[in-house]
Each structure stands twice: as C-alpha cells, then as structure tokens.
Amino acid sequence: MSISLYDHQRSALEKMKNGCILCGGVGSGKSRTALAYYYLQQGGNLDIPDAPMKNPLDIYIITTARKRDTCEWEDELAPFLLSTHEDCNYYKNKVVIDSWNNTAKYKDVKNSFFIFDEQRVVGYGAWTKAFLKIAKENKWILLSATPGDTWQDYIPVFIANGFYRNKTDFIDQHVVYDWRSKYPKVDRYLNTGRLIRLRNRILVTMEFERHTTSHHQDVPVSYNIPLYKDISRNRWNPWEDRPIETASELCMNWRRVVNSDESRSVAVLEIMAVSYTHLRAHETEADL
C-alpha cells in the first residue's frame, strides 16, 4: 500500500477535524486528502509503509450521481485497500458510494464515517434534514470548492457542529429581514465577527497552485523532398499553377509540402494508438 500526498494535502490534514469543510479547487486532491484523514482517524500511519487501520468504521461517501456512476471514488479508495466490492475490500468494513439524491436512505446509520462530496447542504430541504440527522450520530466531513456564498449557506453546517440549536436560533441572533419586501429577504447580518470566527473554525482551505508539466516528443517524419526543391528553385506554386510572388508565399508553400505529407498523419495515428493502449492498460489495472 503506497499513499503519497503533496505538501498542501499534508498541511490540510493537520488542520482537519470532525465536522470541517475541506475547501479546494479542481485538481487539489480533496478526495485523496479526505480519505487520508479517515485513514489516520482509524489508526493508520502515513509515515509507515503498509501500516493498516485498526477496525475502521464503515465509510459512506455521498457525492454527485456522475461521480458515483463513473467510479471516480473507487480509484481514490484503492491505495487505502478499500473498495465497495466486498471481495476486494481488505478491511471488510462497509464502503458505500451514493448520490445526494439518496441521502435520506442513510439517515438512520450510526457510528460510521461520512464524506459529503461537492457540498449540497444549503437551504433547509430534504438533503439538509437528512444531513443533520446523520451528523448527530456519525463522524463526518464536507468537501467543497465553493463552501458558501452567504451566511445562510452555512446554517446547516453551523447547526451540525453545535454552534446553534436550529435555524430559528441562527436567525434570531444574526438575521435582519427587509420589512419593505413582500417576501423574506435578508437586509443585513448582525454580529458578523462571530460568524467569521465560526466559519474559520470549520473551514480548511487547501493552498494549492497548479503547475502544468510540459511533455515534448520529437517524432521525425519524411516529406516530398523533390517537390520541396522544385519550389525553392523555380519559385512556382504547384497547387495554383502560377509563379510565387512573395517571400511569405514561398514559406507557405514549403510548410504545405512538409505538413501535408502522409507520413505525418501516420505518425500521429501511431502516437494516439500507443496512448490508447496505455490508457486501457491503466483502466484494466484499476479494475483488478
């Protein structure tokens, strides 16, 4: 078992705790970091190769339907020797990956660990009610790229962390509605200093800078050398059957000779075939 983490992921791990929101952009590795947190909480050790967990809790991952159906989380689970398939799961605990639409199915689960991916617990609908019931009886963390646009978006997470008894308690302490509006519209928030402190207690931001690695490969190909030389010598455009009038037109004809040669297309197809073979091999290994 090899579990490797980047520095920004290890830094986030040091700040994470039950009930936190792990905030990071696309490509920051939120999923890997969340599973590493679970691994550590269940007795694992990132500094000791092959260090097993000790009687890990059942883990439930609530994510988008797309991520569930494309098995993205299955790939993330593999380095931790976890799988939704019982015969592939080293620890034999229950591993469930499901979508937010089915959150209510798990509202009676207790003494387990939940990862809520792509946070959807805003407002006060069915998802939020199920989330609050789950949060009372289980360990949990949230993953999000955009944790909240307004203070009201944080109400469910604040309640789940025990900062407020319920939505009414939050509103009584912090919300002033616009009395001129025909529908409930927030005019302003009170005591925002406390709200900022509470948000900072649960928000773990991943300081991540994406670095693109360029890969260059030189592939020698042939071209029609006699035609290239004829154009150079005679200054004649063979495609339009007329004299070449300018230096830029001469360069364009040279490029056309080189770029339109069949050998270039063959080379591109060969590169694509090799890349596809490597991709299929990687997918096959992931399925084993």
Model features per residue range: what roles?
Residues 1-20:
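Conserved pre-motif I regulatory segment
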Residues 56-58, 113, 130-212:
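Conserved P-loop NTPase motor "coupling/switch" region that bridges the ATPase
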Residues 261-276:
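Conserved interdomain hinge at the start of the Helicase C-terminal
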Residues 31-52:
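Walker A/P-loop NTP-binding motif
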Residues 110-130:
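SF2 helicase catalytic motif II
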Residues 19-35:
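Walker A/P-loop
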Residues 56-77:
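Conserved Walker A/P-loop ATP-binding site and its immediately adjacent core
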Residues 277-284:
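Conserved small/polar residues in nucleotide/adenosyl-binding loops
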